[in-house]
Amino acid sequence: MTKLKHEVAVPAAALIHPTLMLTGRSASAVYVQPAAQLRRLANAGAIIKIAHGYYVAIPVDKRKGDWLPSLETLTAGLATAIYGQGNGALWGLSAARVHGALPRAIATGFALGPSQHRPLALAVRPGEVHFRMRDPERLEVEYLSTELGPGLVTSIEQTILDLSGQEFVSDSEPRVEAVRNLMAMANADRLAELAARVRGRAALARARKLLANAH
């Protein structure tokens, strides 16, 4: 167990391996009354409630500061907590943020997994996380390292196709900025091959048109 302030410890067995995420279900492996114990840990500053039913253990080296993970990190943690390790991933604008293609902050996190899940309002910052039912095994995803543990994120090329799945409405929407920046990062051959494999040729055509219109 890791010692935190006020001599309160978060049992490793209560965490959702291999992350710092906790839920009532994961805490029940240690506590008879998990809800009460999670409240105790939160009141002691050992964990943070990030959404209804979901908590994060504060790392030892962050316990004295105002530590708060980014929206993308929280989204990745929730995806793993809900779907299990290797079954949830960041996609869409969240993936674009991770890849550095969307500098401006957004208020919504986007995650995918093998089943549908209701949106979760965040308790620690304005915003919410939306979930989409998609099988990550059918997508091109990459390993993602976060403060809360390992996760997955759609590749640059997959993110381009995802964000270009619908017509672009105006240049002011964040998808436009994200796709233009991602196209500059992408491997053209890999993108074309992926588009052919996942029936994304129409999406690729939109992305190419968007890039051409920018010049």
For each feature predicted by the language model, list its residue ranges.
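Short gly/ser-rich loop at a beta-strand->alpha-helix junction or flexible surface loop bordering the NTP-binding
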Residues: 18-25, 35-142
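Exposed alpha-helical structural elements
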Residues: 10-11, 37, 69-78, 94, ...
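N-terminal low-hydrophobic presequence detector
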Residues: 1, 5, 60-61, 68, ...
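Short amphipathic alpha-helical interface segments
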Residues: 2-26
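Detector for methionine-enriched segments
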Residues: 1, 21, 133, 183-185
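Alpha-helical residues within the helix-turn-helix
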Residues: 29
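Hydrophobic alpha-helical interaction segments
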Residues: 108, 136-215
